[in-house]
């Protein structure tokens, strides 16, 4: 195996993180990205780490599993977390970013590193005799996807992913909405569009009957629960949306609210939330409203939302096919291929789900590719850490029932001793144990 550099194929969240981790360890990187020459159906730019779905990296507190994962990544000097914090926009207890500023930051930070050579080229073959990380994401080009399937000897799996619409803030009718974060956590960062029972019923019926865009595939529609299209939720039952993205709890009317309401109830029957999408607050996305409706139908139905009667859509919601590997049979916990030690895979194609999780897989793959380059022992992060629980889960779960997975405390190893009943106290203890363990690993393995 030639060891003059490490190849990273794909400059998304995982690939950008992997390239950064390798370069900071003094190893030359060839970072291949086809966007700029050839686009995917979902990407709009040629920038690194483009966020094609939401602009939220989810919960920030370490008593939330993804918040703990972010803190672990911060301590491992993640460029993705650094970019997110630099381009953060208000979002209550969540970490949301200005999506363009975020991609700009990652692009500059990675491409300006003296050891990173960016090559705008489509890779159609898997390198055999060089250390390589493939992080081409769920929208891998057909040519390379076919080679990966051929290499793995399996068709792999797929699911459909969806993105929510983005609207112009100037087109919102602020007489019918109010600003508030759920349970008043943090600042009043969300715009809330309240619905009466009658308005909700009409909205649900319109969603159910709205015309969907055709799928570019003969396969059945399979969707990841975390990105369930809003129209699919509406079809699942009357209360599905009320316990999902339109949940009203913690979003009581402010005293000054003068719009329509059901009698004297303090809380709306349903609420649609809008989250700031860029630093200047000129754009907002409709939280949890991933959709596959035709664009004309999106405009018709979503303008039924109070305050959005004249909404101008900067981007309509879209759905795309995501592919992922049979990781339980194909990958090690280090994200190495079981078939070829010098080949790593990272990102959503491995079956981790979510922006933060994808970047975390790139971080682990990058660290271990660098270890292999230097003839050192690879690092297996223990499953008592969030960053170790994900690779353990995707490589040890039952292959027959394997589906994309977000980080949750359910996959982090339980605490020893009697179970602590109070969730916040229990998760605080889990987080403390995880961070203490990670501190020891960083010191022992010289990962800082």
UniProtKB/Swiss-Prot annotation:
Keyword field contains Nucleus: no
GO annotation, biological process: tRNA methylation; tRNA wobble uridine modification
SS bond partners: none
Keyword Secreted in record: no
Pfam families hit by this protein: GIDA
CC terms in the record's Gene Ontology section: cytosol
InterPro entries xref list: FAD/NAD-bd_sf, MnmG-rel, MnmG-rel_CS, MnmG_N, TrmFO
EC number(s) per entry: 2.1.1.74
Family annotation (PROSITE patterns): GIDA_2
Binding site for FAD: 10-15
Protein's cellular compartments: Cytoplasm
Keywords: Cytoplasm, FAD, Flavoprotein, Methyltransferase, NAD, NADP, Transferase, tRNA processing
Gene Ontology MF term list: flavin adenine dinucleotide binding; tRNA (uracil(54)-C5)-methyltransferase activity, 5,10-methylenetetrahydrofolate-dependent
Predominant place of localization: cytoplasm
Cofactors: FAD
Catalytic activities: uridine(54) in tRNA + (6R)-5,10-methylene-5,6,7,8-tetrahydrofolate + NADH + H(+) = 5-methyluridine(54) in tRNA + (6S)-5,6,7,8-tetrahydrofolate + NAD(+); uridine(54) in tRNA + (6R)-5,10-methylene-5,6,7,8-tetrahydrofolate + NADPH + H(+) = 5-methyluridine(54) in tRNA + (6S)-5,6,7,8-tetrahydrofolate + NADP(+)
Function: Catalyzes the folate-dependent formation of 5-methyl-uridine at position 54 (M-5-U54) in all tRNAs.
NCBIfam families xref list: gid_trmFO (TIGR00137), PRK05335.1 (NF003739)
Family (UniProt): Belongs to the MnmG family. TrmFO subfamily.
Name of the protein in question: Methylenetetrahydrofolate--tRNA-(uracil-5-)-methyltransferase TrmFO
Natural source organism: Lactococcus lactis subsp. cremoris (strain MG1363)
